[in-house]
Amino acid sequence: MLSFNPDKPNFIVMVGLPGSGKTTTANNIGERFKMDVFSSDEYRSIICDSPADQSKNDEVFKRLYHDLRYSLEQGKSVVLDATNVSLKARLRAMAEIQGINCHKIAYVMTTPYETIVERDSKRRWKVGEDVIKKNFLRSFLFPAWGEGWDEIVVPSITREVLDCPYKEFETLWNDLAAKTMNFNQNNPYHSLTLGAHMGKTADILCNTGIRNDSIITAAMLHDIGKLYTQTTDEQGISHYYNHAAMGTLYLMSCPKLLGLDNYDACLQALFYVSWHMMAHDIKKGTDKTKSKYRRILGNTTYDLLLKFGDADTEAH
C-alpha cells in the first residue's frame, strides 16, 4: 500500500515498538527508493556512544531534525527511523517539518508483540520487556488522519486480507468468540463477560443510529487486548493495563479478523480500538484538553470517539 508522490519530497515516519523491525524496514525503503534515513539510534551512537543511551535525547532529536529538515528542503525524500508510537512524538515530527511541501506517510509496524519481545531479548542493546511496556506500549496510539498524514501504511493489510473468504473469517471469528464469551473479566467494574461487553457496546452504538461498519467492528473487538494483558492484584481483582495498545497490535498482526474489505475502513477500525480508552480521558479532561483533541481529530471523529466511549461505559 506504500505509494509516493513524484512531484514533491516524501517524508516517511516509522511507527513501532523497539524490536518491531523499524530499522531494517526503514533501511530497505531507503535503499530501494534512494531516500535518506535518519535514525535516532545512530544519532545516539554519535552523541552518547551508545544507541541505548537515552540521557541526551533533547540533543539527539535536535540534531536529527535539523539534518532531516535540511534534506527535505533540498528536495530529498527521507525516512525517520524512531519509535514514534506516541501522539506527542508524531506531532513533534510534523512541527519540525512545518512549512515544507512534502508527502507525509506514517508507516506502522505490525510485528506481533511476542516476536518483538523475543527479538529484543537477543539484541546486544536490550530494551527489556518492562521498559517496552512502560515507555512504549503505554503511549502507543494508532496514527490519526488529523495529525496531518497524506497516507497511513499498515503493511499487513494486503489485497489478500481485504479479499478474505467469508468461511475463513467465520472460522477466525468463532474461535475468538469461544474465548471472549467465556472470559470472566473478574473486575467489579464489569458484570459481563468480555465477549458480552464488546457485543453490548456495538449494540448500543447501533441503537444510537451509527451504521458505520468500521466503528461497529471496532466495538465488537475493542477490548480484545484484555485476553493478553490480564494481571491480578492481591485482592484478586483483575486489571488490563495497555489492553487498547495490545489489542491494536494483535489486530494488525491478524487483520483478517476485522472482516472488512476496504483498506481505509480497516484503518478506521484500528483507530477506534487504539483510541477507545482516550475517549474516557478526554471526557474527564479540562476544556483545554477537549479543545486540543477536537482540533487534532476534527469534529466528526472527535464526536464519534466520545460516543464510542459512552457506549463502552454503558455496556459495563
Question: At which residue positions do the language-model features occur?
Answer:
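Short glycine-/polar-rich loops that comprise or flank the Walker A/P-loop
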Residues: 75, 100-105, 146-151
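Phosphate-binding P-loop
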Residues: 2-8, 71
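Short glycine-enriched, charge-decorated loop/helix-capping segments at active-site entrances
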Residues: 50-56, 121-126, 233-238
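ATP-dependent NMP and nucleoside kinases share a basic, alpha-helical "lid"
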Residues: 46, 72, 85-125, 135
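Conserved substrate/cofactor phosphate-moiety recognition/catalytic segment
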Residues: 24-76
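Acidic/His-rich, divalent-metal-binding segments that scaffold phosphate/diphosphate chemistry
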Residues: 156-238
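Conserved GTP-binding G-domain of TRAFAC-class P-loop NTPases and closely related GTPase folds
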Residues: 10-15, 20, 28, 113-168
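Divalent metal-dependent catalytic cores for phosphoryl transfer on phosphate-bearing substrates
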Residues: 206-315
